[in-house]
């Protein structure tokens, strides 16, 4: 089975309070975005599909054949390793932390091997899972710790799953606040449910997904949803943005960790009401005096957006960040979303911008540049670094 995943955007993101369990309660509107996505293939049995073979060829790696049904995984590793990397590879300890094991998300690990840094493979200790991850920019994480592997494992705790091979080509940006990894996990759950005839409905799948990540459950439903709690409490929400074109921009060389984004953020519950937790005015000063005007070709910060919608930041914008304006207390997201889109600029806020923009002022410059290019609304998605803008068609 082959599926194409998608990512998400956040329309507004309020950090409400810190909970006793260390997580934060949030409120946001998740919206599917199909501009980016990964390619996921799951195969039961021993055959390699035409697609998986093409994946190995694309990354100039010889496809190794792994048969999990005839002997122990350890006995078969040497041939597989030699086929993959041209020689034996030392086994790597892949066990998760005790905290993850308590969550039931850990996958007993046996071996991970890498080919040229762009394609990695891992085999579970029991030999039932082989996972291959490929990415042009390189894969610097262990495949057996990937959320796709954890999705298989969490279902395997309750169901007798057959041996499978998972092939994942990462094409969506990593560390951009678009939820690409969470989407991979959710689509893995859905694919395994169908392939293995588990008969789980979306509600049950979302319960498994919520154990893997705060925004994983959204991708089970994959329609506009208001997320609360950690993001796993979902409520359908009807919104019509058909009058607007949405541009998603991925700044080059800027990745933001969620932990970094939360560092220094002040939850809204402890703030006075009626004010907003946003940075003050940001001004973009383009090299071209006319670049900040509205242009039909939508030059962003003096630079045209390329054909993929990506903005490569080249220093044309000089950012000037004023003092943060007074922070805001609790607001009702539905009330804000009901406003005309033209009023969202001053009311629909991503609270992470306050901390992330301080650490990465170039993102503030890009956001201002989006408004300079006639965007009706612009925001960072999730904890960044991706930004998006709505333009009137």
Q: Which residues does each predicted region cover?
A:
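Solvent-exposed alpha-helices and their adjacent loops that cap or buttress functional pockets
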Residues: 32-33, 210-211, 217-220, 237-242, ...
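ATP-binding N-lobe of GHMP and related small-molecule kinases
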Residues: 1-176, 194-203, 239-241, 251-254
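Contiguous, small/hydrophobic- and glycine-enriched helical/loop subdomains that border
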Residues: 185, 189-226, 233
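Conserved hydrophobic/aromatic beta-strand scaffold that supports enzyme active sites
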Residues: 2, 39-41, 224-226, 246-248, ...
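Conserved, helical-rich catalytic subdomain that frames metal- and/or nucleotide-binding sites
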Residues: 221, 226-377, 392
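Glycine/serine-rich anion-binding loops at beta->alpha junctions
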Residues: 141, 167-196, 214, 377-391
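Generic non-transmembrane alpha-helical segments
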Residues: 150-158, 204, 208-211, 355, ...
């Amino acid at each position: 089975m082959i599926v194409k995943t998608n990512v998400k955007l956040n329309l507004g993101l309020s950090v409400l309070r810190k909970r006793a369990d260390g997580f934060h309660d949030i409120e946001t509107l998740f919206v599917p975005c199909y501009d980016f996505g990964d390619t996921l293939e799951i195969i039961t049995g021993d055959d390699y599909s035409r697609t998986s073979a093409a994946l190995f060829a694309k990354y100039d790696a010889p496809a190794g054949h792994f048969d999990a049904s005839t002997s122990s995984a350890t006995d078969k590793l040497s041939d597989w390793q030699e086929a993959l990397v041209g020689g034996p590879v030392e086994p790597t300890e892949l066990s998760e932390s005790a905290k993850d094991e308590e969550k039931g998300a850990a996958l007993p690990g046996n071996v991970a091997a890498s080919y040229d840094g762009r394609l990695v493979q891992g085999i579970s200790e029991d030999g039932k899972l082989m996972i291959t991850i490929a990415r042009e920019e390189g894969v610097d994480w262990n495949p057996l710790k990937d959320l796709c592997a954890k999705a298989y494992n969490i279902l395997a705790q309750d169901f007798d799953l057959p041996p499978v091979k998972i092939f994942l080509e990462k094409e969506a940006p990593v560390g951009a606040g678009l939820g690409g990894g969470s989407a991979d996990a959710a689509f893995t759950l859905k694919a395994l449910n169908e392939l293995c005839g588990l008969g789980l409905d979306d509600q049950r799948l979302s319960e498994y997904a919520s154990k893997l990540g705060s925004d994983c459950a959204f991708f089970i439903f994959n329609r506009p949803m208001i997320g609360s709690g950690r993001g796993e409490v979902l409520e359908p929400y009807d919104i019509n943005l058909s009058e607007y074109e949405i541009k998603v921009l991925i700044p080059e060389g800027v990745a933001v960790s969620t932990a970094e984004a939360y560092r220094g953020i002040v939850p809204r519950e402890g703030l006075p009401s009626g004010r907003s937790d946003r940075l003050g005015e940001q001004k973009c000063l383009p090299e071209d005096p006319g670049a900040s005007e509205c242009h039909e070709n939508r030059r962003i910060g003096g630079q045209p957006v390329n054909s993929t919608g990506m903005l490569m930041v080249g220093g044309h914008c000089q950012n000037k960040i004023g003092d943060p304006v007074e922070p805001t207390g609790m607001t009702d997201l539905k009330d804000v979303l009901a406003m005309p889109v033209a009023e969202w600029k001053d009311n629909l806020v991503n609270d992470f911008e306050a901390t992330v923009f301080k650490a990465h002022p170039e993102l503030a410059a890009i956001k201002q540049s989006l408004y300079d290019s006639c965007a009706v609304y612009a925001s960072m998605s999730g904890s960044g670094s991706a930004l998006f803008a709505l333009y009137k068609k």
